[in-house]
């Protein structure tokens, strides 16, 4: 019930016909068009769940003997396109035209072995008495990385990352200081304080004049509410005027 009207009324005794409230609008998802487009985009046309529908085999096509055995392709005759290579000569056969190599393979191999550099065995370590061998270089037992030139030096990418973090922190601090400077408290001058005080007093006089113009008899709810509203406004204005008259120095927040 609206507070501006009285709760008691003779019209309340009139019986009213009950009317069925209208149904709310049907819910329609906002993603309907998106889902429809996705289904048309990714769905395979004419695809079904499970095996496809096939024709029922006819009784005339009954199973015959050896019908499911795999049939081999017909054999083709092998045709040689290139002539055969000559066979390897026997040990008893002599070379054609008496051609022989004068190279002494035995002495050549012996000289290569004597003059060649001996292969160094791969360094290994044995961890058990049964002779289990493992690679020594990848085992971590050999001081490999501590002998590097850049061992113990901060990597370049970490230095670059630290500089970026430091620069970002400085920019953030400057941004915070700038916001604090903009939001600093501002002191009202004597002229501004006096202008605000006179404006409050003028507003109080206007509200008080309107309050004095009210009727003597307050016999309705709207009149009571109007009177209460004017009293609250006058009370707030009196409080603000008292604060400004009591304190000579006033600070306000700078909203710029």
From Swiss-Prot:
Alphabetically list the UniProt keywords.
Calmodulin-binding, Cell projection, Cilium, Cytoplasm, Cytoskeleton, Flagellum, SH3-binding
Gene coding for it: ENKUR
Q: Where is the IQ domain?
A: 176-187
What is this protein for, i.e. what is its function?
Answer: Adapter that functions to localize a calcium-sensitive signal transduction machinery in sperm to a calcium-permeable ion channel. Microtubule inner protein (MIP) part of the dynein-decorated doublet microtubules (DMTs) in cilia axoneme, which is required for motile cilia beating.
Disulfide bridge map? none
Q: What free text does the record give on domains? A: The IQ motif is involved in calmodulin binding.
Q: Which PANTHER family match?
A: ENKURIN, ENKURIN-RELATED
> What is the protein name for this chain?
Enkurin
Name the residue ranges of motif: SH3-binding.
83-89
Q: Which organism is it from?
A: Sus scrofa
PROSITE patterns, per the entry? ENKURIN
Q: Which GO terms describe its molecular function?
A: calmodulin binding; SH3 domain binding
């Amino acid at each position: 019930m609206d507070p501006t009207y009285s709760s008691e009324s003779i019209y309340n005794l009139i019986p009213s016909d009950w009317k069925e409230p209208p149904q709310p609008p049907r819910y329609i998802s906002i993603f309907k068009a998106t889902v429809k487009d996705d289904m048309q985009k990714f769905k395979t046309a004419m695809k079904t769940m499970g095996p496809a529908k096939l024709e029922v085999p006819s009784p005339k096509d009954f199973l015959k003997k050896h019908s499911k055995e795999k049939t081999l392709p017909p054999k083709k005759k092998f045709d040689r396109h290139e002539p055969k290579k000559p066979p390897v000569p026997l040990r008893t056969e002599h070379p054609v035209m008496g051609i022989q190599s004068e190279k002494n393979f035995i002495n050549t191999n012996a000289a290569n072995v004597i003059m060649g550099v001996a292969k160094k065995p791969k360094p290994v370590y044995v961890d058990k008495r049964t002779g289990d061998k493992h690679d020594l270089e990848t085992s971590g037992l050999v001081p490999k990385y501590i002998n590097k030139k850049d061992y113990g030096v901060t990597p370049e990418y970490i230095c670059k990352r630290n500089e970026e973090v430091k620069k970002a922190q400085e920019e953030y601090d400057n941004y915070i200081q700038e916001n604090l400077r903009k939001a600093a408290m501002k002191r009202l001058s004597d002229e501004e304080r006096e202008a605000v005080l006179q404006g409050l007093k003028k507003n109080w006089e206007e509200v008080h004049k309107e309050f004095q113009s009210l009727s003597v008899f307050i016999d309705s709810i709207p009149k009571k509410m109007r009177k209460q509203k004017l009293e609250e406004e006058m009370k707030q204005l009196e409080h603000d005027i008292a604060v400004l008259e009591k304190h000579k120095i006033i600070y306000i927040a700078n909203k710029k």
